[in-house]
Amino acid sequence: MTAPASPTAVPRATLRLQLHRAFTFDHARALLDDIAALGISHLYVSPITTAQPGSMHGYDVIDPTRVNPELGGEEALGRLVAALHARGMGLIVDIVPNHMAVGGAHNAWWLDVLENGPASAWAHAFDIQWQPPQPALHGKVLAPFLGEPYDAALQGRHLTLHYDPGAARLAIAYHDHRFPIALADYAGILRGAGTSGERDTDAALDAVADRFAALQSTRALHARRAHADAARTALRDFAATDAGRARIDRAVAALNAAPEQLHALMARQSWRLAHWRCANDEINWRRFFDIGSLAGLSVERADVFEATHALIFRLYRQGWIDGVRIDHVDGLVDPAGYCRALRQRLAAEDAHRPADRRLGRPWIVVEKILAADEPMRTGWDVDGTSGYDFMNQVGALLHDAAGEATLTQAWLDWTGRPAAEAHFRATALAARRRILHEHFAAELDAAAWALHAVAQQQRDAHDVTWHAIRRALAELVVHLSVYRTYADAHGRDAQDTDIVRRAIHDALPHLRRVDQPLLVRLGAWLGGEPAGHDRLRQLALRRGQQLSSPVAAKAVEDTACYRYGRLLSRNEVGADPGAFALDAAAFHQAMAARARLWPHAMLATATHDHKRGEDVRARLAVLSERPAHWLAAALPWRAAHAHWVRTLPEGPAPTPDAQWMLYQTLVGAWPPGLDWRDANGVRAFAERIAQWQHKALREAKLRTDWLAPDLDYEQACHDFVFTLLTGEAASAFLPSLAACVRTIAPAGAVNGLAQMLLRVTVPGVPDLYQGADLWDTSLVDPDNRRPVDFAVRHRSLRALQANPEHSLAPLLAHWTDGRIKQAMLARALSVRAAMPEVFAAGRYLPLPLSGSGGAHALAFAREHAGRWVVAIVPLHAAALLGHAAVPAFPAGAWRDTTVCLPAPLASMPLHSVFDGQMLCGARLALGQTLGALPVALLHS
């Protein structure tokens, strides 16, 4: 079935592609026939604006006004769009409003800020604190881009003055970084080399120097910029002559030969160089998380909003793009206000789109991490999230709550942790506290100073000290159960009021009694009372709310999830590892709410940011059903491998925690078709595991981390991996590992197929991450961004198209190649294409099950205007599979289990999409419905 020729505002299904210089718009265009054949309506791509040269992801934007030339530029984008439209498809793009890449030598806006300081035309575009408490940074930007202490860089001649003839700019060079010199210093630098004896050259240089010297007396900003442009043009002309360039080179060389003079020059600039480790303590501008090469943007300012979105608005107006996914919306000052403004601007452009591309309401989803029991806000005027909440829901559904206690105790016993650390919350709180104080100390200081300024306005808070505020604020942030609150000048809503109330309650015991009353004050200052037009209150609110989000992200996703290893399939972006499982009733309730509130939100099970591929998680979920099987394998492995655990002064390498998580990762990520005797295949797998482990160890921040890596520990852990997989231990370990995987892999595949079918059939817009149409055993980036073998996928898809009506059951004989997953996905998406209204606007009806296997399946119907779809998937079915070598249930496994259909379906024939059966009756026997294949999709 083909996609409709006319565009629709809401995609039927999306496919995410990661674009970079080795995979461009033209590469994507070459895949469109296969993407369309798979049943995808919209291509969904990583950011397309100009990023740092060589960027592999596009989130490090340096110019939001231009299509990335490394992707082929606007011309290649136009070819892709034309090819999409010819197939009745559309384009969704990822946008990055929160930040831009800085450092290096390519961001013109940032370089202008460094050159001109607060007087820069772009100074207000970045969230810079120009008057921080540190006097050394007044009117300056901290530039923490050095890989060594400042004095070592200066004395080692790694900091040198450099003239760029193309830009007519003098700048300090440090490797690939450029730090522009203020124009007011040009005259002194140019005259610093003395005279040459060549009258004309000396006169020309003096004339150029005079132009720059005159800038100091020009006060009007517009006039100053015009004079600066003229002076730079004069310098460019002067440098174009051999004599002129020689004079400039001489002046530059003179300064480079005098470190003290060079230091004095740098001290006068609007930037202050520092070692990159200084950023966490002293940075005076907002970063993306704790990444010093990504600077926060002030898109809450109307002119910055327009400047950073001009390209997106134009592409939407042209009909080239049909919607957006907003990256890191929680980083913004006012996420709700931003989303509403974006909706209004795109809607205004819709009337100017080509007549055949008008959508009325563009599709907008946000990357928003929702905490447990945190609903998505309904007042943002978006279509929903980008799908991490669904990934969490479906992932938890696949887990069997019965295994939680056994796995929890096993984790404690293995690691020697106390019972107090049994729950993930303890690990998360410890990580939050460390991340806040070690990685966001500067941001915590800034928020505390902003709140202190508010306190000084109030007579009854006259004696509240900055240090007391800092202590109380830190505990409030640590105990906040969500990423952030969304108070504005009018105060906070009931949802946030409850969140802050709980955070205050939880924080109280961690403060001295004398500081405890401050928590209530902070609650009032941070949105509990309307800030109105009070700028100090508004600043304090902004600093506080923009602090908690990156702390939560780095502490939970990027620290605690690498420390707490009970069952790694629950350690995922958007998930709470402490919430082990979700029962069928709760899942149905969540899907009914999704149908009611968010019918057009994105549904994801794999992304460019996931920790583990969707089928790794699906396989590991089987361990919740078979914890004894896991321990029967892991405990002997630990004993057998004790000889290769190295003893270092700080303790064992790897630690018990790391060893447990390594074994789970090996079991989960072992490629389905890999033979343990395939030396090359196993070595390639070992390289991937070692890469994962290196990142996991540093993210955990226990024995090593990114700030101060312990290379001896890392090397010992690296050696341990290769000893197990390719070294002395391999001959015994590999067959044992393969046997362990073999016993749970069929059940894992059933979970994977169930997860896929749920994604395609529940309310929302299913997204397919690149390559995940076959088994996805990827790990955290960069592993999940490896090149995809699209040729293999092309061949299997064409073979499927050659037999469109055949049962897919024969594919189970070779299930490890993943063709069964791709075929089921394509068939399911074809039903979405044939019955779009059922999925876009249809009711969600849970269907009851009865019989001995009723607890091991989930079924529901979607209905619209008398058209019906029924989906049936198994749950926790390892016991039903028994010792089956394929993901198919043995005869008699389901015994008397049936699904009860709604009355309108009782006499209506239903076509089984995957095996071609025609079924009819008030009850469907799962022994028949799931007799040939492990999941079923039926339609009227």
How would you describe each model-predicted region?
Residues 1-53, 65, 70, 78, ...:
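Carbohydrate-interacting/catalytic domains
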Residues 55-68, 106, 110:
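Surface-exposed, active-site-proximal loop segments in enzymatic domains
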Residues 80-128:
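Hydrophobic or amphipathic alpha-helical targeting/insertion segments
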Residues 90, 323, 363:
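Hydrophobic "anchor" residues on beta-strands that sit immediately upstream
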